[in-house]
């Protein structure tokens, strides 16, 4: 593929950027009174207002032309056809199959995978109902009241986010906890107040060899056996989400209680697979299927909608526009709903593990910026924290506001005040306050520079009627496909993650040097060697 920066469509955008880079949003809105209603799109229960972006109709036309030139439509079709678009691992990328309806046909190597997907979903539903109803009891006969999901990365971030987002729909007599970090403090605090006889562990690891997950799983087994004293208890208090039946059985888990998934499901795209078992237990199968339906609605919108009305495509192209032309390095995710407090962390993995790449699909170094940094905090907490920098700092930050017309917990004027703040922040970022306006308000001349807001800070706003399982599914799918769009433009592989491997290898070498009773002779750089010696000295081990 021709280098991105050499194609005519990219050159046209460079020329266009130079023409409009200093145009203020105040001017764009003044010259086009209908802009706020025209630059919107809607699908799958989500309303998308992108009018507060530093773009014109010509910008959007040029971005759409770029998408066509980079073969975005063909790449979308290839993913949905089950082609092996993850070329470095020779795998299909078919998280969309996980939420396809029962009668759909999606082929991988000529085999329809949808029946197998629904077979796993049906097994998950049956097990979830057993736990929720109390029919599944622990080793002592007590019903299960506590669910602890042990995983890391995609086996943790998705389930945590979905549970927190949809907690209002959950079975409140069940306690859900999540353990991911190999730091023992994580496990200790998650289980401190739990009764082992009433606790079920879900161990989520495709290979059942993941260091962090299996370290925590072995600790969980020891914790359980210390209380119940019989190895047979493991089979009543542990289930697995894995494809390694031999390791699952060796651990003591009945393989009848092993829920599998496929190598065409990437970890950060896996929350709608068996990785979502804890979510299904918490919400119930019906709400889980509602969430899948929301995912599927956005999948179909992404697959079929024209690019100029396609929410993920527009969102992804705008991200490219800011990253590559304005030099924007970060995107702030600002959900004005406390149930979405873990959504920014979830998107960090989805976006940064996907598009944090520096070589093209053909292995050539890129000559342009790729994935930006994602971060955020629920409103209005962030307003009293980092919004100062977004409003008056020297860095341009792209903001995504997410809000809902109805709250799940009506309490007086709380929700109206919350949403007033969201709308106000987007308005303030876009239009700011001039020095003249500050002076007209009576601000002393010496103070006016400090009370001037430059504005022209871009933002997107997503609005839905209320946060439901279906809306959450649509929202997550939108970001998944926005990431895909960005990766297609940049010609990178959004579906591998080789960057996490080197640290794992080095940790495997260093761990014995930390734990050895005999002083090792570490062969690292002088800094790492000194840190190892300091650590061993403070741990009271031989030097």
Swiss-Prot record:
EC number: 5.3.1.9
Listed GO CC annotations: cytosol
Cellular localisation: Cytoplasm
InterPro entries, per the entry: G6P_Isomerase, G6P_Isomerase_C, Phosphoglucose_isomerase_CS, SIS_dom_sf, SIS_PGI_1, SIS_PGI_2
Presence of the UniProt keyword Cytoplasm in the record: yes
Alphabetized GO MF terms: carbohydrate derivative binding; glucose-6-phosphate isomerase activity; monosaccharide binding
Pathway: Carbohydrate biosynthesis; gluconeogenesis; Carbohydrate degradation; glycolysis; D-glyceraldehyde 3-phosphate and glycerone phosphate from D-glucose: step 2/4
Pfam family, one: PGI
Catalytic reaction list: alpha-D-glucose 6-phosphate = beta-D-fructose 6-phosphate
GO BP field: gluconeogenesis; glucose 6-phosphate metabolic process; glycolytic process
Family named by the database record: Belongs to the GPI family.
Name of protein: Glucose-6-phosphate isomerase
Lineage of the species this protein comes from: Bacteria, Bacillati, Chloroflexota, Chloroflexia, Chloroflexales
Gene: pgi
């Amino acid at each position: 593929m021709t280098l991105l920066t050499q194609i005519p469509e990219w050159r046209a955008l460079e020329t266009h950027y130079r023409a409009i880079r200093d145009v203020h949003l105040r001017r764009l809105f003044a010259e086009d009174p209908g802009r706020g209603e025209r630059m919107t799109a809607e699908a799958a229960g989500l309303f998308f207002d992108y009018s507060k972006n530093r773009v014109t109709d010509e910008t959007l036309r040029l971005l759409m032309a770029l998408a066509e030139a980079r073969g975005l439509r063909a790449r979308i079709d290839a993913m949905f056809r089950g082609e092996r678009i993850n070329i470095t691992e020779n795998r299909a990328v078919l998280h969309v199959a996980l939420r396809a309806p029962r009668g759909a046909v999606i082929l991988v190597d000529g085999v329809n995978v949808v029946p197998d997907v629904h077979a796993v979903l049906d097994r998950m539903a049956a097990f979830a109902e057993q736990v929720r109803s109390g029919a599944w009891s622990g080793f002592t006969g007590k019903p299960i009241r506590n669910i602890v999901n042990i995983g890391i990365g995609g086996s943790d971030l998705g389930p945590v986010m979905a549970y927190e987002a949809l907690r209002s729909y959950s079975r409140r007599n069940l306690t859900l906890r999540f353990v991911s970090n190999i730091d023992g403090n994580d496990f200790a605090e998650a289980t401190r107040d739990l009764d082992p006889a009433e606790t079920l562990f879900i161990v989520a690891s495709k290979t059942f060899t993941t260091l962090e997950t299996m370290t925590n799983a072995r600790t969980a087994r020891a914790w359980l056996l210390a209380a119940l004293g019989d190895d047979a208890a493991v089979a009543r208090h542990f289930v697995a989400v894995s494809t390694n039946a031999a390791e699952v059985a060796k651990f003591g888990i009945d393989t009848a209680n092993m829920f599998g998934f496929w190598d065409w499901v990437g970890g950060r795209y896996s929350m709608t697979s068996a990785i979502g078992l804890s979510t299904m237990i918490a919400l119930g199968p019906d709400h889980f299927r509602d969430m899948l339906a929301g995912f599927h609605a956005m999948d179909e919108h992404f697959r079929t909608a024209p690019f100029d009305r396609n929410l993920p495509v527009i969102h992804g192209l705008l991200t490219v526009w800011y990253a590559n032309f304005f030099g924007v390095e970060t995107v702030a995710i600002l959900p004005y709903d406390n149930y979405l407090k873990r959504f920014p962390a979830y998107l960090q993995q989805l976006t940064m593990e996907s598009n944090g790449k520096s070589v093209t699909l053909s292995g050539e170094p890129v000559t342009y910026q790729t994935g930006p940094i994602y971060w955020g905090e629920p409103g209005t907490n962030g307003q009293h924290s980092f919004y100062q920098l977004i409003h008056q700092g020297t860095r341009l930050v792209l903001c995504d506001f997410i809000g809902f017309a109805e709250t799940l917990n009506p309490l007086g004027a709380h929700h109206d005040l919350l949403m007033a703040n969201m709308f106000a922040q987007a308005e303030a970022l876009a239009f700011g306050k001039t020095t003249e306006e500050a002076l007209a308000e009576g601000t002393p001349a010496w103070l006016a520079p400090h009370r001037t807001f430059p504005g022209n800070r871009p933002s997107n706003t997503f609005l839905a009627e209320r946060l439901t399982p279906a809306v959450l599914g649509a929202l997550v799918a939108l970001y998944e496909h926005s990431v895909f769009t960005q990766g297609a433009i940049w010609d990178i592989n959004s579906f591998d993650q080789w960057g996490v491997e080197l640290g794992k290898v080095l940790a495997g070498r260093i761990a014995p040097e930390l734990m050895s009773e005999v002083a090792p002779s570490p062969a690292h750089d002088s800094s790492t060697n000194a840190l190892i010696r300091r650590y061993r000295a403070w741990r009271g081990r031989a030097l």
